């Protein structure tokens, strides 16, 4: 008994049991698992970051596609409204030309309208319509004045008159001219041009415009078209739902937005004030939501994608497993 105890105390190795072999196998597998896990963790993080960046890029592409579709709808709607406005203006102009009395637009008209009922001065009265073939009083007066004007023969040099009568009896031939007739003849001589001016100043009555805009009754279609799509842009990407200026000056930035200084003022000058304000507000709401206030589409896409990624250029490295367990760590737990 004592000999066996001494043999054990002298360091004689005992034979391996099945339990000890199983434990050694378990610790060896755990070591391999730890090595594999620590080596693959940085790669997994890099892969997850790349997947997240790709997902952001896909979402951004979907958003830009939605904006392009909305912008297309806005452009199509504006073109339809432009066509409808042109058709309406043409119909109003045709009705105005057909309703204009003969000789009203003549530059040398000698006929002035009577002070009776007409479509500019008073409401239409059906009772004053003359029968076919019947000459009205105003027409008879007009014909009489014309005959009287044709019968007057004035000398080469107009002599002095006293109350409309020639003072010198030796002057040939004596002709009595009434001051009232002369005044009336002058009004007939210049009545046509005055009436034309009256018609031009009263375009607002026919077209529903203010007096200042009456000269621009026939608006050009180019004044309603959208701004230039291919202008140079120096603006940086900003929010998609607001503009500092009106949307017509900084609107279509898909290929570059023109500056507000380069915008022509002819369209805004010829538009009616209420209509111009409505177009500005409506365009600001639609164009700002559709395109935002960005610069060029390519630069905005590149900047957004680069800012969203922010990935390292090299795959990150990990610490060695020896720094965690030591250089001489024995996973087999053998002595």
Curated annotation (Swiss-Prot):
Chain positions covered by the region annotation Disordered: 152-179, 252-271
GO (cellular component) term, any one: nucleus
Biased composition (Polar residues): 257-271
Domain of life: Eukaryota
Assigned keywords, A-Z: Phosphoprotein
Signal recorded as keyword: no
Positions of post-translational Phosphoserine modification: 257, 260
Protein name: Uncharacterized protein C4F11.03c
Organism: Schizosaccharomyces pombe (strain 972 / ATCC 24843) (Fission yeast)
